[in-house]
Amino acid sequence: MFETVIGLEVHCQLNTKTKIFCSCSTSFGDEPNTHVCPTCLALPGALPVLNKEAVKKAISFGKAINATVNKKSVFDRKNYFYPDLPKAYQISQFTIPIVEKGELFIKVGGEIKRIGITRAHLEEDAGKNNHETNKSLVDLNRAGTPLLEIVSEPDLRNSDEAVAYLKKLHSILRFLNISDANMQEGSFRCDVNVSIRPKGDEKLYTRVEIKNLNSFKFIQKAIEYEVERQILSWEDGKYDEEVYQETRLFDTNKLVTKSMRSKEDSAEYRYFPDPDLLPVIIPDKMMEEASVLPELPDEKKARYVKDLGIKESDAEVIISSYEMARYFEDLIEAKNSPKLAVTWLCVELLGRLKNGVTIETSPVDSKKLSNLINRIEDGTISQKAAKDVLDYVMEHDEDVSSVIEKLGLKQVSDDSAILAIIDSVLSANSDKVAEFKSGKDKLFGFFVGQVMKEGKGAFNPSKVNDLLKSKL
């Protein structure tokens, strides 16, 4: 039997307006090489100037994970050659990172587990190589974008724990509003380090790094494949031959990892302090300001459960993303019932989001859903009719009130109309009326169902209940 040992390195782009060492824009998706300057291009004589907003965001992250934020940290040069790295070195932090010794708690299989975070350090992103048929082009718009590299301890033991850790980390970054953490745009990138060892063995064996992972689904698949590959190599007696320190890429079509290059040790990067940048000394005022944090996911969950009476499982769905929590907060701020807000957001709306549509891109915004819930609460429509309204507004950009009128779904609350149907139902079921009066109370539900059926679902259920009780 084997135990899996996993450590994760996450590169998170910080959402500053300008790059970490110059004033070029960090906007995504613009024409190649339009956000560059002598510093980005590594022209002789161009000197870096540190973006203090990046430092503030790093401090906030450190405080959020209960880490040590070093008042003094140092930038180093990480030396390597690659076409998208104009200086032939990357400015990073090696000897003294800005954040170290943090922690994060995940929940897997109902169990809470602590995952240590070794360090989080600031560095600059590289450019991007675009490979065409017979040539490669380099876009340096991304070069110099501020990154926070977050390195976990090797505390993760399977792919489920790894994904839970990444999702928790992702949500913290979003709730802190220090990164958009968009995996598709590359602002939340993950490298996975995987090794195996016999159960009970404390030794750390050869680790393999996996790159090219841009979704939680593929991260899980890559880990599972790599663990299986290493176990088979061990069992076949080929572990030393087939498992060595290397970087592998994940093929998202074949769902396998493939060798890319041998993995470098830190010594090969020849780190040394960057002579162009002074040590970072964080002033007390900046430390104090950046330590004021917004409400984080776990705090929100606790508040929802305690103050709003929401089930813990529902609260976990709501805090699963910043957009979900913001949507829910909008409903509560609009004075919607927490119970109805949970049902209509987590069950009805989420159940209708398909084909890549997210809560952020949903055709039904929080204002529209709030109006729908209001119409349920004030008795204008039934919950059943509200589902029809939601189906309609998912496909048509119309307001809730006009759709209710158009589809004729307004509830009937007129006593005389309801009483006429009640009289008809009771008359047609006189034998059951006698049984009810002799003590068969459960028949009340039958009468309610018959009245609602005759009213084609347009009657107000509360009104039907009250009038039936008075009649019986």
Swiss-Prot record:
Q: Does the keyword Kinase apply?
A: no
Entry's EC annotation: 6.3.5.-
Query: Which Gene Ontology terms describe the biological processes this protein takes part in?
Result: glutaminyl-tRNAGln biosynthesis via transamidation; translation
Q: What is this protein called?
A: Aspartyl/glutamyl-tRNA(Asn/Gln) amidotransferase subunit B
Q: What class of enzyme is it?
A: ligase
Key words, A-Z = ATP-binding, Ligase, Nucleotide-binding, Protein biosynthesis
Give the record's subunit note: Heterotrimer of A, B and C subunits.
Q: Which Pfam families match?
A: GatB_N, GatB_Yqey
Q: Which PROSITE patterns match?
A: GATB (PS01234)
The protein's job, in short, is: Allows the formation of correctly charged Asn-tRNA(Asn) or Gln-tRNA(Gln) through the transamidation of misacylated Asp-tRNA(Asn) or Glu-tRNA(Gln) in organisms which lack either or both of asparaginyl-tRNA or glutaminyl-tRNA synthetases. The reaction takes place in the presence of glutamine and ATP through an activated phospho-Asp-tRNA(Asn) or phospho-Glu-tRNA(Gln).
Instruction: Tell me which domain of life the UniProt entry assigns to the organism this sequence originates from.
Output: Bacteria
Is Cytoplasm included in the keywords of this UniProt record?
no
Recorded hits in NCBIfam families, A to Z, give:
gatB, PRK05477.1-2, PRK05477.1-4
Q: So what family is this one in?
A: Belongs to the GatB/GatE family. GatB subfamily.
Q: Which GO terms describe its molecular function?
A: asparaginyl-tRNA synthase (glutamine-hydrolyzing) activity; ATP binding; glutaminyl-tRNA synthase (glutamine-hydrolyzing) activity
Reactions this protein catalyses? L-glutamyl-tRNA(Gln) + L-glutamine + ATP + H2O = L-glutaminyl-tRNA(Gln) + L-glutamate + ADP + phosphate + H(+); L-aspartyl-tRNA(Asn) + L-glutamine + ATP + H2O = L-asparaginyl-tRNA(Asn) + L-glutamate + ADP + phosphate + 2 H(+)
